[in-house]
Amino acid sequence: MFENNLPSVAVLLPCFNEEVTIGKVVRDFKAALPGAAVYVYDNNSTDRTAEIAAAEGAIVRKEPR
């Protein structure tokens, strides 16, 4: 998984009910690491965490209980 002799990078963000902050967190990681894949692991949130993360370009995985 090396491209241009650099390792691939993935950012993994576990979260629960983070709709207030998740958009900024995803944007900041995408700006700091433009080649990285940003994954948000939503741990059964009851708010709009997953929706907001996806809208900001994160790859969202939902973890049901």
Go through the PLM ranges and name each one.
Residues 1-65:
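Structured catalytic core of nucleotide-sugar glycosyltransferases
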